[in-house]
Structures are given as structure tokens and as C-alpha cells.
Regions:
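Bacterial N-terminal signal peptides that target proteins for export
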Residues: 4-15, 19-33
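Acidic/polar, low-complexity intrinsically disordered N-terminal segments immediately downstream
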Residues: 5, 50-156, 160, 164-167, ...
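N-terminal export/membrane-targeting signals
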Residues: 32-40
Length: 365
């Protein structure tokens, strides 16, 4: 059984990390611009640093960090509450130590000190990876941990911006899908992207107009997702990424407020990820997968919200999207299709896949 579990871990990891994913599974996954925005728009949102630790020297700071590592090594078990508490403690301790060393220019003057900090930091990450195996974490646990350890958790300024943007996205739900076949939808989708690139996006109104029109196309596309397995969609993915990148460039140039670009585009991405995930669940519950490749692609798209919704994006979840996420969480353990895909007992899949998702999150901390 242990050998089979180890094999499953490798299979799950390969599925998650594989670059041989059909382009359709990445249509919704245009997060590169969000990472660009994180770098070039630092004034949009920020969390304050609270240096609660008082160091007398760089050696003192490193000893504190080493002591925290020792406390983690002593932990033999964990649960969701403990994991969240320790992850937040790690972040605050790491930030405080790092900022102290940076202020003292230690990283520039002492390579040995920099190497020690990195070694301790990597060892702490290893201990958190170990802790993922000390409790049977569920999909709900993974979501809770991501929510409660986000640096934007309880950020009132961000929540205010989300509340301001929410009516725009709620209104999109009332717009009907296109009543046409997949060929027509793909043709119209490509035309929208081409026209948008030609026109350009230079104002908030331009951005919202694009998000609204794109939303109709994307939801219409998802209605035919099951029959898109043979379609080449790389051009749609590339054009979408190009437009998103241009939106953030416009924000950098001051044409669109940085806050608006970050919040609306983040909410757009979260919305698409969850729409894609729920559409796949509906298909996989009601239709027979045409091939193992299609089944793997569906699994990849279903778990994408757990992987791709980052610390900023998860803080923009609306109540409706949290409900959608709960639906995904409730459906994943029920479907025997997933267990069949990985050829293993369903109970094992129900805690091993969440474990791997949690490990992936730890690697981003």
C-alpha cells in the first residue's frame, strides 16, 4: 500500500507540474500579468511591517530564526489551526529578520551571514513540507490555510475595493450566453481579441468593456468545453495574455489606476478559474471522458483554483465565489472518476491530492 501511495504522489505531482497540458486547459490561466503587476505596481496595495523582535546584532537575528526552526523540528503533528498559526509566525519572523539584516547591509558585507539565512529559511520550508504529512488535510483545509495565511487577510482597504467592484461582476451573471455552435463561438472569441488589441485599452472604461465582453465569450466557450478537446487554442491564450499585459502597462503609465487594474483583473481571473472548474465538474459528472488525456486535462482544470489563486487573489473572493469554491470542494471527493484516473483507492486520493496541493503552496511561501 505504501508503494502504491508513493506512486500516486508521483503521478499527482507529474500531473500538476506537467508542461504537456493541452492549450484549452490554460485558456483561463492568464496569471502572468498579475505577477508583473505585483512587481511594477507596488503602490497599489501593501501590508505594513511590524518589527516586534528587537535584535542587538545580525548574529542575534539569525539565532532567533534558528530557534524558530528548532521549534518546528520538535512538532510531531499539526492541524489546520496550527498550520495557519505557524505559517503566519514564519512570515512575520522571516520578514523581521530579513529587514533587520537588509538595514544593516549584512547581505552585502557578509556572504556567510546571507548563506546562513538562506539555509535556515530553506530548512523551515522543509519542515512545513514535513508538517503537511502529519495530518490528513482536506481540500477545505487547503483553502482555509491559503485564506488565513494570505498577507492580505483582513485587509480593509482591499476589501473595500472588492466591495466596490463586486456589482460589476454580479451584473455579468445576468447576461445570456451566445446561442451558437463552438465554431462560431471560437470565431467570435478571436474577433473580440483582435479588435481589442487594435483598439487598445487606455482607460478604466476600456478595461471593463473588455472584461464584460470577454466574460460572455468565455462562459459560452465553457458551454462547449467537452467538445473542444481537438481544438487548437494557443492563439487565444497568447492574445488574451497580451491584452492583459497591456492593461497593466496602461496602469504603470498612469492611464488606469493601479488599484483598479489589480483588483478588477484579479477578480476576473478568480472568476474564470472557478467558472472553468465548475464547468469541468459538471461535464465529468454527467459525461464519459473521451480519453485518459481529456480526463487528466479536466482534473488539471478542476484543481487550478487551488494552485493559481495567489495570496492577493484569494483576498478578492466574493461570497458567491467562495460558495463556488465550496461546491468544487464538495464535489471532488464524490467523483469516482478521479480515483479511476489514478488507479487507486478513492480514500487515498481524497487526502493525498490535497496534501500535494498544500505542498505546492508551501513552496510559494
Amino acid at each position: 500500500m505504501k508503494k502504491r501511495i508513493q506512486t500516486l504522489k508521483l503521478q499527482i505531482t507529474h500531473c500538476i507540474l506537467s508542461h504537456e497540458i493541452d492549450a484549452k486547459s490554460m485558456l483561463h490561466h492568464t496569471l502572468l500579468p498579475l505577477f508583473i503587476a505585483w512587481i511594477v505596481l507596488p503602490t497599489c496595495m501593501s501590508c505594513s511591517d511590524d518589527d516586534t523582535l528587537d535584535f542587538q546584532s545580525s548574529e542575534d537575528a539569525l539565532k532567533v530564526y534558528q530557534t524558530y526552526l528548532g521549534s518546528l523540528k520538535d512538532m510531531k503533528t499539526s492541524n489546520t489551526a496550527i498550520f495557519c498559526k505557524e505559517a503566519n509566525t514564519w512570515r512575520s519572523t522571516s520578514d523581521t529578520v530579513f529587514h533587520y539584516l537588509m538595514r544593516d547591509s549584512v547581505f552585502l558585507k557578509d556572504n556567510n551571514c546571507a548563506e546562513r539565512f538562506t539555509a535556515i529559511h530553506d530548512s523551515i520550508r522543509f519542515e512545513f513540507l514535513r508538517l503537511t504529512e502529519t495530518w490528513r488535510y482536506s481540500y477545505e483545509d487547503v483553502l482555509k490555510i491559503k485564506e488565513q495565511t494570505s498577507v492580505f487577510h483582513d485587509d480593509k482597504e482591499l476589501q473595500g475595493a472588492v466591495n466596490e467592484a463586486q456589482p460589476f461582476f454580479l451584473k455579468l451573471d445576468s447576461i445570456p450566453l451566445l446561442e451558437s455552435g463552438k465554431a462560431s463561438i471560437l470565431r467570435n472569441y478571436r474577433k473580440l481579441l483582435k479588435d481589442t488589441k487594435l483598439k487598445g485599452i487606455n482607460t478604466k472604461s476600456d478595461m471593463l468593456e473588455f472584461i464584460g465582453k470577454e466574460d460572455i465569450m468565455f462562459r459560452s466557450f465553457l458551454a462547449h468545453l467537452y467538445d473542444m478537446d481537438k481544438e487548437s487554442l494557443a492563439d487565444i491564450t497568447q492574445e488574451t495574455e497580451s491584452i492583459c499585459r497591456n492593461i497593466f502597462i496602461a496602469a504603470k503609465e498612469g492611464k488606469i489606476k493601479a488599484r483598479d487594474a489589480m483588483v478588477y483583473m484579479s477578480m476576473r481571473t478568480v472568476r474564470r478559474l472557478l467558472q472553468n472548474s465548475t464547468a469541468c465538474i459538471s461535464d465529468i459528472n454527467h459525461q464519459q471522458m473521451k480519453s485518459k488525456a481529456q480526463g487528466n486535462a479536466y482534473l488539471w482544470m478542476i484543481i487550478q483554483p487551488f494552485i493559481s489563486i495567489d495570496q492577493f487573489s484569494i483576498a478578492t473572493l466574493t461570497p458567491q465565489e467562495r460558495s463556488q469554491f465550496n461546491y468544487v470542494i464538495s464535489q471532488l471527493p464524490k467523483s469516482t472518476k478521479f480515483a479511476k484516473t489514478f488507479d487507486i483507492d478513492q480514500r487515498a486520493l481524497n487526502y493525498l491530492l490535497p496534501q500535494q496541493l498544500l505542498k505546492m503552496y508551501v513552496l510559494t511561501l
